[in-house]
C-alpha cells in the first residue's frame, strides 16, 4: 500500500507492507501530475514500514528513474533497513537529483527544505 501527499513542489510517498506494481503506477501518476505544476520536484520516500516489493516494481523503477532523470531536485529516503538503504543508492546512477537517506522523517523533511 502507498499513501501519497502533494504539497507545492514536495511529493511525499509512504509505503506500507509490500510495494506492488499498482502502488508504483499510482506513484508514477502522482509524479507526472506534480510535474505539470512545477519543473523540478522534491521527493520524500518513507520506506520505514515497507516489507518488500515485487520483481516487476524493480524493473519499473529503473525505467521510471531513467525517464525522469532530470525531474527531481532532491530525493530523501527514510528507512532504518540496511537492504533498503543499499537499494536506495541504485537510482543515483540514473538521476542528477541530490539523494540522501535518513532514519528520521523530520530530518529528511528539513533537508528537503534546505534547513
Give, region by region, the residue ranges found by the protein language model.
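Amphipathic, Lys/Arg-enriched alpha-helical "gate/interface" segment within cytosolic domains
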Residues: 1-115
Amino acid at each position: 500500500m502507498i499513501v501519497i501527499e502533494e504539497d507545492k513542489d514536495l511529493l511525499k510517498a509512504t509505503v506500507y507492507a509490500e510495494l506492488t506494481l499498482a502502488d508504483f503506477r499510482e506513484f508514477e501518476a502522482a509524479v507526472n501530475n506534480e510535474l505539470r505544476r512545477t519543473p523540478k520536484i522534491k521527493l520524500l520516500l518513507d520506506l520505514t514500514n515497507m516489507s518488500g516489493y515485487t520483481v516487476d516494481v524493480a524493473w519499473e523503477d529503473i525505467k521510471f528513474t531513467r525517464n525522469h532523470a532530470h525531474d527531481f531536485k532532491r530525493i530523501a529516503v527514510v528507512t532504518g533497513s540496511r537492504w533498503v538503504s543499499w537499494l536506495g543508492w541504485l537510482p543515483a546512477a540514473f538521476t542528477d537529483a541530490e539523494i540522501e537517506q535518513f532514519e528520521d522523517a523530520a530530518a529528511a523533511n528539513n533537508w528537503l527544505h534546505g534547513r
